[in-house]
């Protein structure tokens, strides 16, 4: 009787152990899934400040379009920010998108639009063109909007060449009161130019950026 009882206990213990191994495997799988999901979430969170484009195009051949512009999607006529790396710094800008309201465009039918009601506006954008011929280039950009009473907003465009950055300030001076920024005399020695912009305003700031061109002088 004792042997039968002992045998039953041993069988039950083995069954529990086997079941426990199965559960442990399941828990490990779940933990691995959770870890992978967490890692994915962390990666997405790190990239969450970057406004994704459907396809990140880049001009690596130094070939201009039919208008002589070396930038891709300089007038934001694509449905996304193709060609540009647009970053919503600290995820504070509430609206940062392609705007299809022609009245808010400098040229074409769309523009880059930004707005924040409760948070500050803070975003940056850039695009690199490589494979350029030797010569001198000129960057031109247009911006309009309002800084919501911010007396010291950060609004500038830049050209980065050979590790040196040249800046030109922009202004938010009212609805469709466009301010044109120009940076002439850009002379790369390695065939590459990075152009971009940075905008920071108090809560309530809004505006659009449009028709950015990089042409050979």
Regions picked out by a protein language model, each given a short descriptive name:
Residues 162-192, 202:
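Extracellular carbohydrate recognition and processing domains
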Residues 140-175:
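Extracellular ligand-binding interfaces
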Residues 25-66, 70:
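N-terminal, intrinsically disordered, polar/charged segments of Gram-positive cell-envelope systems
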Residues 17-20:
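C-terminal motif of bacterial Sec signal peptides marking the signal peptidase cleavage site
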Residues 196-205:
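Short beta-strand-plus-loop segments that form exposed binding edges in beta-rich domains
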Residues 76, 123-153, 182-185, 212:
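Extra-cytoplasmic beta-strand recognition segments
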Residues 75-112:
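Extracellular glycan-recognition surfaces and repeat-rich motifs
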Residues 111-124, 171-174:
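Extracellular beta-rich ligand/substrate-recognition surface
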